[in-house]
């Protein structure tokens, strides 16, 4: 089976039948095509070339059976061993895959380096709440400047933390790079929509962030990352609907 088979399948929702368990040797990822947290698992599986299939879930009308995969009904969830095992949460699944496939390990095995990558990811993750606040400001001018400023501050902090080509501190992307990329990609999509966006959609994120701009272009051009991503026009279209309160989880299909 190819990596990420079914990534663009239509969502399963309440009333839809539960799919048969994945066969032995196949890793199933429960996903939503535009969710940055689920995309972390997709990118990791893609980079590590894990034979996997993707089942997309409707996050407003979740199937009852899905709560047996993830007790909160969130994505991502990883299902394996013919449905006997489940691993949940966007940072735990990548680490689990590294332990399962150590020959293609991304997260360092050295305890100190491993902790440093996790701590760095926590610092970079400040972009996530700032993104959602700025997104809500798209249709509400009240407090917009403050929300934009908080998002810019998250980018300024990341620019300082990026001391080389990658947040891994090495010659190729690492754990923090792959897991934080989806959040920056969402800001890129949002830059096409926001009134008076503080970021450039042409040379994202813009001239004030030269290191991040190079980093983003590099990550975005990696084939395995692209395979786990939605095209820009799809992301922009989805978020246009999302900001109107009518998200279409099958947008573009």
Swiss-Prot record:
Active site positions, chain numbering: 35 (nucleophile)
Keywords per UniProt: Oxidoreductase, Transferase
Domain GST C-terminal: 110-238
One Gene Ontology cellular component annotation held by this UniProt entry: cytoplasm
Residues involved in glutathione binding: 62, 75, 89-90
Annotated EC: 2.5.1.18, 1.8.5.1, 1.20.4.2
GO biological process terms held by the UniProt record: glutathione metabolic process
GO molecular function per UniProt: glutathione dehydrogenase (ascorbate) activity; glutathione transferase activity; methylarsonate reductase activity
Catalytic reaction annotation: RX + glutathione = an S-substituted glutathione + a halide anion + H(+); L-dehydroascorbate + 2 glutathione = glutathione disulfide + L-ascorbate; methylarsonate + 2 glutathione + H(+) = methylarsonous acid + glutathione disulfide + H2O
One Pfam family per UniProt: GST_N_3
Transferase recorded as keyword: yes
Residue span(s) of domain GST N-terminal: 25-105
The family this protein is said to belong to: Belongs to the GST superfamily. Omega family.
Entry protein name: Probable glutathione transferase omega-2
């Amino acid at each position: 089976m190819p990596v990420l088979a079914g990534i663009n399948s239509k969502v399963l929702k309440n009333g839809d039948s539960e799919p048969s368990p994945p066969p032995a040797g196949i890793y199933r990822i429960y996903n939503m095509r535009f969710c940055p947290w689920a995309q972390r698992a997709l990118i990791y599986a893609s980079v590590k070339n894990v034979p996997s299939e993707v089942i997309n879930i409707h996050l407003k009308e979740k199937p009852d059976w899905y709560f047996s995969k993830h007790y909160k009904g969130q994505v991502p969830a990883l299902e394996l061993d013919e449905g006997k095992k489940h691993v949940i949460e966007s940072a735990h699944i990548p680490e689990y895959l590294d332990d399962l496939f150590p020959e293609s390990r991304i997260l360092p095995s050295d305890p100190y380096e491993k902790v440093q990558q996790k701590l760095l990811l926590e610092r970079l993750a400040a972009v996530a709440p700032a993104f959602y606040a700025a997104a809500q400001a798209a249709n509400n001018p009240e407090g917009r400047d403050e929300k934009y400023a908080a998002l810019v501050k998250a980018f300024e902090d990341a620019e300082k933390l990026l001391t080389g080509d990658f947040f891994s501190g090495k010659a190729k992307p690492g754990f923090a790079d792959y897991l934080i990329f989806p959040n920056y990609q969402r800001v890129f999509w949002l830059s096409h929509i926001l009134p008076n966006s503080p970021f450039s959609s042409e040379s994202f994120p813009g001239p004030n962030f030269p290191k991040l701009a190079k980093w983003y272009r590099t990550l975005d051009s990696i084939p395995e990352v692209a395979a786990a991503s939605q095209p820009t026009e799809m992301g922009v279209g989805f978020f246009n609907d999302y900001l109107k309160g009518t998200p279409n989880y099958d947008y573009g299909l």
